[in-house]
């Protein structure tokens, strides 16, 4: 019996590893095609885009610049060189943002700020969105459902209005009414983080509130909830010990994805 159990466990592990390898392989192939497509599309833009002072350059200088960038080579050769350098950790140098500064240096300076913003926004989103989802689910069981309606209105607003609109609104409101600084720099005070963190957390607040409310409402229709209610267990106890715990399990799978989306979104905020 023990041997069969071990073989079954080993088989499950192997199947899971095979599944993970398949998913990772597909993701890498997709990433390869996306990067290649973007690379090829970027190479189709006019030559003027590669020079900040194109109108002041002679034809010979333009040709020399194109040769220096390697743009005179066939597209497959350029793509192969790009992947070769990228695998070595060489992403080239900036020609417009910061002239002749390695891209890896620029990223090394900016990524810590993006990660800090993303982590702070995620913590705020969970601290607000999860209680909001709980309150909406509890309000859904009342007669007037006021809290559920207000929360639903907030979620619909955040999802319907373009992010740039309420980013701008928060920026104007925070700077004019509360006199909050708008720039985050290495020497900025903690107040400079309020506007970007709040702006980044709003989509995830709505996201967590919406899904947690849905899962909790679904749990209230289960048989174990009816049984606990029939036994006279308090509604708050059922909500806290049973409904919330079971409803929060599906939420965990969304946290990594939402964190990545938050970090990517911080580029716009910054």
What are these regions (language model features)?
Residues 38-45, 82-84, 153-183, 199-201:
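Membrane-water interface segments at the C-terminal ends of transmembrane alpha-helices
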Residues 27, 110, 114, 153-160:
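Residue-level signal for discrete positions within transmembrane alpha-helices
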């Amino acid at each position: 019996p023990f041997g069969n159990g071990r073989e079954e466990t080993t088989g499950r592990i192997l199947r899971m590893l095979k599944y993970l390898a398949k998913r990772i392989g597909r993701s890498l192939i997709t990433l390869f095609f996306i990067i290649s497509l973007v690379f090829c599309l970027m190479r189709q833009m006019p030559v003027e885009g590669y020079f900040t002072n194109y109108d002041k350059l002679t034809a010979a200088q333009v040709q020399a610049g194109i040769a220096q960038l390697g743009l005179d080579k066939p597209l497959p050769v350029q793509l192969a060189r790009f992947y070769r350098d990228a695998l070595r950790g060489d992403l080239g140098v900036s020609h417009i943002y910061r002239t002749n500064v390695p891209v890896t240096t620029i990223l090394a300076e900016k990524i810590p700020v993006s990660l800090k913003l993303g982590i702070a926004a995620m913590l705020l989103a969970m601290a607000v969105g999860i209680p909001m989802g709980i309150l909406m689910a509890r309000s859904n069981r009342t007669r007037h459902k006021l809290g559920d309606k207000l929360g639903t209105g907030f979620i619909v607003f955040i999802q319907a209005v373009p992010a740039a609109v309420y980013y701008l609104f928060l920026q104007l409101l925070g700077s004019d009414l509360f006199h909050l600084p708008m720039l985050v720099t290495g020497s900025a005070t903690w107040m400079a983080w309020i506007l970007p963190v709040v702006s980044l957390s709003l989509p995830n607040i709505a996201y967590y509130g919406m899904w947690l409310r849905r899962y909790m409402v679904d749990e209230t229709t289960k048989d174990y909830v009816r049984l606990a209610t029939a036994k006279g267990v308090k509604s708050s106890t059922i909500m806290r010990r049973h409904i919330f715990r079971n409803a929060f399990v599906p939420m965990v799978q969304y946290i990594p994805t939402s964190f990545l989306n938050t970090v990517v979104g911080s580029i716009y905020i910054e």
